Regions:
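C-terminal low-complexity, acidic/polar tails when present
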Residues: 84-85, 89-163
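Acidic/polar loop-and-plug regions of large Gram-negative outer-membrane beta-barrel proteins
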Residues: 1-39, 54-85, 130-151, 156, ...
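Membrane-embedded beta-barrel scaffold of Gram-negative outer-membrane proteins
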Residues: 35-51, 55-63, 214-217, 221-222, ...
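Outer-membrane beta-barrel translocator domains and adjoining extracellular loop/strand segments
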Residues: 1-8, 59-66, 120-126, 188-196, ...
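Structural signature of Gram-negative outer-membrane beta-barrels, strongest in the C-terminal barrel
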Residues: 85, 104-108, 112-116, 154-245
Length: 245
């Protein structure tokens, strides 16, 4: 809907700017993985988790582009999006239980690795045949995708590795957790609209801590603080423009 009127009228909130003849939302997702655990001793356990995933998406729709002042005719644009993502993740961790005086420790250390490949395609078509009068909408537009122009055609590859160490300490009704992690990442982007290539390498140390007191009544107030790191895979829509940083 609209807040301001156009020629004394308002676009209703349930108005469909797309078209039933060109409106597709399709997604297929496949995942496979495993969880492995081996106990070397009562206080020493090894775990390994792995997962592979494939996600395929296709979208077809019309979007609002612009309109003339005080006009009831909307200029629309037809768009087709296709995206395929392949991901693999592996996590190895070792858990060790020990006591130092009256304090119980649960130590957790590990190494994880993640790799992904993301292919994106966005094509657009425009023309007066997509115009729509919102005061008297007539749907059933015919879209010719052979006239589309490519707006985005790229492939991004991510490799990320991380080392982490955590200690969870228990003393009477107190629980204190402290952990640290260091990440390395590399993002490679191939922009096929202008045959350009960019690469971004980042590394970061992050940490977290939390303190909890468990009352006998079951109430457990806590306080925590954490930092995090996530590689940025987003890129600009404009062809040939370098990725966001």
């Amino acid at each position: 809907g609209t807040v301001k009127s156009a020629d004394g009228k308002y676009i209703p909130r349930d108005f469909n700017v797309s078209d039933p003849n060109y409106n597709q939302s399709w997604r297929e997702q496949t995942m496979i993985g495993y969880e492995l655990e081996h106990q070397f001793a009562d206080n020493l356990t090894f775990r390994q988790n792995a997962r592979y995933a494939t996600i395929k998406q296709k979208y077809r729709y019309l979007v609002y582009a612009n309109s003339a002042a005080n006009s009831t005719v909307l200029t629309r644009r037809a768009q087709r999006e296709e995206r395929t993502t392949n991901e693999f993740g592996l996590d190895n961790q070792l858990e060790y239980l020990l006591e130092t005086g009256s304090v119980n420790h649960t130590l957790l250390g590990g190494f994880d690795y993640k790799t992904s490949k993301d292919k994106q395609l966005l094509a657009r078509g425009s023309g007066s045949q997509y115009d729509l009068d919102w005061t008297n909408p007539v749907y059933g537009v015919n879209v010719d995708e052979s006239t589309f122009k490519t707006a985005t055609d790229e492939q991004q590859n991510l490799d990320q590795m991380g080392l982490y160490l955590q200690d969870q300490m228990s003393w009477n009704n107190w629980e204190w957790l402290v952990s640290g992690r260091y990440d390395w990442s590399e993002v490679r982007t191939n922009d096929f609209t202008d045959n350009s290539f960019t690469q971004q390498n980042d590394n970061k140390f992050t940490w977290r801590t939390g303190l909890l007191y468990a009352f006998d009544s079951g109430l457990s107030p806590y306080i925590s603080y954490s930092t995090s790191f996530e590689p940025n895979l987003q890129t600009n829509r404009a062809p040939g423009v370098a990725p966001f940083r």
